[in-house]
Amino acid sequence: AVATMADLAPCDIVVEAIVENLEAKRSLFKHLEEVVRDDCLLVSNTSSLSITAIAAACRLPERCGGFHFFSPVPLMKVVEVIDGVRGAAWVGECLTALARRMGHTPVRAQDTPGFIVNHAGRAYLTEALRIVGEGICAFHDVDRIMRAAAGFRLGPFELLDLTGLDVSHPVMESIYEQYYQEPRYRPSPIARQRLAAGLLGRKSGHGFYAYPDGRQQWPEPPPVPA
């Protein structure tokens, strides 16, 4: 652990995982360049933002790359390795080797909105929110069906609660805007309203589910008609 930015000076690689906001990340990378050596890799854990755009704020954009882990990191072994337009080939190669040394499975991805997983998996969250918004069924029924019938370890609303709407909703908005407001990526007003209400998920103690004592509480099933 470090106490100040200056403590990062001897590092060979710095992985950023701050708020999913382009300007915040660009500002941080610019500051990091004033601290670390010129051969230090500056890497972002962004799940949706352009590595090229983040690196553009840097004096040495060729040493920047993307290194996107999935939550929970100890269980989710895939990590996306992303090359920016001006990124040097050796950066991606170093990140690929590092991921393997960490026991993860690296996958090289192009610098496109959402990369691979958050692009391919958009429908898992957005369609689940749309189903609930249209009144087709309750959110916990969607989760139960996706776990029992489709074999997912987490239903979409459990996943939203685990990640936190303060992370998930900005990612939805980012991908929607980066694809020029493609309708199939449109975020849900349900997520926006719950984010405004502070119902973030596990981290706030209440999201789609309640978490008394940190444990997920499933809604009571409706009574069976006599």
PLM feature spans:
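Structural signal for conserved beta-strand scaffold positions within catalytic alpha/beta enzyme cores
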Residues: 1-3, 65-66, 108, 210
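Rossmann-like NAD(P)-binding element
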Residues: 1-42, 49
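Short acidic capping loops at alpha-helix termini that bridge into adjacent secondary structure
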Residues: 10, 38-39, 61-63, 140-141
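Hydrophobic packing residues within well-ordered alpha-helices of enzyme cores
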Residues: 32, 54-55, 171
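Rossmann-fold dinucleotide-binding core
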Residues: 41-111, 115-119
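NAD(P)-dependent Rossmann-like dehydrogenase/reductase catalytic/cofactor-binding core
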Residues: 100-111, 133-134, 139-226
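Flexible helical/loop "lid" subdomain adjacent to adenine-nucleotide binding pockets
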Residues: 120-136
